[in-house]
């Protein structure tokens, strides 16, 4: 099974502020949906709570250390390892956040789907340093800022060189 991380990063690898994404880019939301639809998504509890519901068209697995925590429409796992063990029959597992789960999953990741957002913003959660791990760019496309997207962004797919 491929382990893939998908994230949108502003300058300095910023991914969040106060458990929210500090931008709204419809182009990135469309990209996220296109990449993840039909694939299982693994997320931390706080990420799930910030989304507020299971993502439709995807198997949703939430990692929570609280054994009593549950939510309708999701599977709960006590760790990343346990979450991935639930998905052994899948071709690709998509790790969708948050920061702690990205940091834990990154050393095992085979692929990164990153949206680079051309914005200098303030926040408290960052994507871990990934450049030193050796990646090959597979694909890159650009979306300019427009009336619906406040910032230009690039969609980049990277594959781990092993």
From Swiss-Prot:
GO BP terms in the entry? dihydrofolate metabolic process; folic acid metabolic process; one-carbon metabolic process; response to antibiotic; response to methotrexate; tetrahydrofolate biosynthetic process
Q: Which domain of life is it from?
A: Bacteria
Q: Does Kinase count among this protein's keywords?
A: no
The UniProt keyword set, sorted, is: Antibiotic resistance, Methotrexate resistance, NADP, One-carbon metabolism, Oxidoreductase, Plasmid, Trimethoprim resistance
Q: Mind telling me which InterPro entries this protein's record contains?
A: DHFR, DHFR-like_dom_sf, DHFR_CS, DHFR_dom
One GO cellular component term noted in the UniProt record for this chain: cytosol
- SUPFAM superfamilies listed in its UniProt record: Dihydrofolate reductase-like (SSF53597)
| A Gene Ontology molecular function term of the record | NADP binding
DHFR domain residues are: 2-160
Catalytic reaction annotation: (6S)-5,6,7,8-tetrahydrofolate + NADP(+) = 7,8-dihydrofolate + NADPH + H(+)
Pathway note? Cofactor biosynthesis; tetrahydrofolate biosynthesis; 5,6,7,8-tetrahydrofolate from 7,8-dihydrofolate: step 1/1
Enzyme Commission code: 1.5.1.3
Regarding protein family, the annotation reads: Belongs to the dihydrofolate reductase family.
Q: How does it assemble?
A: Monomer.
> What does the further note read?
The plasmid pAZ1 determines trimethoprim and sulphonamide resistance.
Q: In UniProt terms, what function does this protein have?
A: Key enzyme in folate metabolism. Catalyzes an essential reaction for de novo glycine and purine synthesis, and for DNA precursor synthesis.
Q: What is this protein called?
A: Dihydrofolate reductase type 3
Q: Which organism is it from?
A: Salmonella typhimurium
The beginning of the lineage is: Bacteria, Pseudomonadati, Pseudomonadota, Gammaproteobacteria, Enterobacterales
């Amino acid at each position: 099974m491929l382990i893939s991380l998908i994230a949108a990063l502003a300058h300095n690898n910023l991914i969040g502020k106060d458990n929210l994404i500090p931008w709204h880019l419809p182009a990135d939301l469309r990209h996220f949906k296109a990449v993840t639809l039909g694939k299982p998504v693994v997320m931390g509890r706080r990420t799930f709570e910030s989304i507020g519901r299971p993502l439709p068209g995807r198997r949703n697995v939430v990692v929570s250390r609280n054994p009593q925590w549950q939510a309708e429409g999701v599977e709960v796992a006590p760790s990343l390892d346990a979450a991935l063990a639930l998905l052994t029959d899948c071709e690709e597992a998509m790790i969708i956040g948050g920061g702690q789960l990205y940091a834990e999953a990154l050393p095992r990741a085979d692929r990164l789907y990153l949206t680079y957002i051309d914005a200098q913003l303030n926040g408290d959660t960052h994507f871990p340093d990934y450049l030193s791990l050796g990646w090959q760019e597979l694909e890159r496309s650009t979306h300019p800022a427009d009336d619906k997207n406040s910032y230009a962004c690039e969609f980049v797919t990277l594959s781990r060189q092993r």
